[in-house]
Curated annotation (Swiss-Prot):
The keyword Disulfide bond does not apply. Belongs to the bacterial ribosomal protein bS16 family. This is Small ribosomal subunit protein bS16. Pfam families: Ribosomal_S16. Coiled coil: none annotated. Residues 113-162 are annotated as: Disordered. GO terms for cellular component: cytoplasm; plasma membrane; small ribosomal subunit. The keyword Ribosomal protein applies. SUPFAM superfamilies: Ribosomal protein S16. Keywords: Ribonucleoprotein, Ribosomal protein. One of its GO terms (molecular function) is structural constituent of ribosome. The gene is rpsP. PROSITE patterns: RIBOSOMAL_S16.
């Protein structure tokens, strides 16, 4: 059976996301896969490429043929060089810089503006006094009494006695 390592498409229009999948060569692009060994998101900066190196090495060793786009991804991650015994097995994958936490950014902005935070970053919301006063001034609605008494239970006995 001819096995290929190929990309199966996910995502929305104009936002492609791919799975790196091992599948029979005769299956369609998004058809049934034998195994999913990674994912690829080209729209992120830098592109997200996650490939399980151990499983990729296994499938290459048993004769699976990568498609051209997958071959480029394997060269970027260094899996193809490792399989072929070529130099550069560490790959040239770009890593995104870690994002600073929002609290750190907030405190840094406060420090730059006034010289330091005067209060906590998170404070519970309080209701405005105008709304509280309006609710207190409004009388509570009284439940309306029905004009005709219900004829059931004890009330039926009371009306029968009178």
């Amino acid at each position: 059976m001819a096995v290929k390592i190929k990309l199966t498409r996910l995502g929305k229009i104009r936002n492609p996301q791919y799975r790196v999948a091992v599948a029979d060569a005769r299956t369609r692009r998004d058809g049934r896969a034998i195994e999913v060994i990674g994912r690829y998101h080209p729209k992120e900066e830098p592109s997200l490429i996650e490939i399980n190196s151990e499983r990729a090495q296994y499938w290459l060793s048993v004769g699976a043929q990568p498609t051209e786009p997958v071959l480029k991804l394997l060269k970027i991650t260094g899996d193809w060089q490792k399989f072929k015994g070529l130099p550069g097995a560490q790959g040239r994958l770009k890593v995104a810089a870690p994002k600073p936490s929002k609290l750190e950014v907030f405190n840094a902005a406060l420090a730059a503006a006034d010289g330091g935070p005067t209060t906590e970053a998170t404070k519970p919301k309080k209701k405005s006094p105008a709304k509280k006063a309006a609710k207190a001034a409004e009388p509570a609605p009284q439940p309306e009494q029905p004009d005709t008494p219900a004829l059931g239970g004890e009330q039926a006995e009371l009306t029968a006695e009178s």
